[in-house]
């Protein structure tokens, strides 16, 4: 069927612009309303009093410093630390009390692509087992899909070396 259509004339279609749209003056850039809050790290409280932190798109094999603010939590005191259940890919750097709650800074390593969730537990110094679970969710892109626009509060701090067999220093046996 596809071979039968080869001899047909190609269809010509036109594009019409709405009135007031200048085709020559348009650019290939996407512009968003300045009032949108899509460019910040989103922190939402879940039903079980844990927090979900959405950090947007990240690139695989890169390390990021993520800073966000948790609202005041009555179960935490001023002396907050990471619970002794460390995550391999998410490391707590600091927790500082601020008027809005707690400013949390952590380092995230994007180790594989897809929608990834890593957890840290925040505990009180000398507390009686009171912990708050914080889940950081990231959408990690592979290295062939460009560089993502990072949200406010997300900063790239380094790239991990990627093993590629074509760039090996080994020349084989002599």
Curated annotation (Swiss-Prot):
UniProt modified residues of type N-acetylalanine: 2
Subcellular location: Secreted
Residue positions, PTM Phosphothreonine: 147
Keyword Acetylation included in the entry's annotation: yes
Keywords noted in UniProt: Acetylation, Phosphoprotein, Secreted
Record bears the keyword Hydrolase: no
Gene Ontology terms for molecular function: protein phosphatase 1 binding
The organism's place on the tree of life at top rank: Eukaryota
UniProt-listed GO biological process terms: adaptive thermogenesis; glucose homeostasis; positive regulation of non-canonical NF-kappaB signal transduction; positive regulation of protein kinase A signaling; positive regulation of transforming growth factor beta receptor signaling pathway
Signal peptide: none
Pfam families for the chain: DUF4517
Any one Gene Ontology cellular component term annotated for this protein: extracellular space
TM region(s), chain numbering: none
Record InterPro entries: ADISSP
Primary role: Adipocyte-secreted protein (adipokine) that acts as a key regulator for white adipose tissue (WAT) thermogenesis and glucose homeostasis at least in part through activation of protein kinase A (PKA).
Record family assignment: Belongs to the ADISSP family.
Name of protein: Adipose-secreted signaling protein
UniProt source species: Homo sapiens
């Amino acid at each position: 069927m596809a071979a039968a259509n080869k001899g047909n004339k190609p269809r010509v279609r036109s594009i019409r612009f709405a009135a007031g749209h200048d085709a020559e003056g348009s650019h290939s850039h996407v512009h968003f309303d300045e009032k949108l809050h899509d460019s910040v790290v989103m922190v939402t409280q879940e039903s079980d009093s844990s927090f979900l932190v959405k950090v947007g798109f990240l690139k695989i094999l890169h390390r990021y410093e993520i800073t966000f603010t948790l609202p005041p939590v009555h179960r935490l005191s001023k002396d907050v630390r990471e619970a002794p259940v460390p995550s391999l890919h998410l490391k707590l750097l600091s927790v500082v009390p601020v008027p809005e709650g707690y400013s949390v800074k952590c380092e995230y390593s994007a180790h594989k692509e897809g929608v990834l969730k890593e957890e840290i537990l925040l505990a009180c110094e000398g507390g009686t087992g009171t912990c708050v679970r914080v889940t950081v969710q990231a959408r990690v892109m592979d290295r062939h899909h460009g560089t993502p626009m990072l949200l406010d509060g997300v900063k790239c701090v380094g790239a991990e070396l990627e093993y590629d067999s074509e760039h090996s220093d080994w020349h084989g046996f002599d």
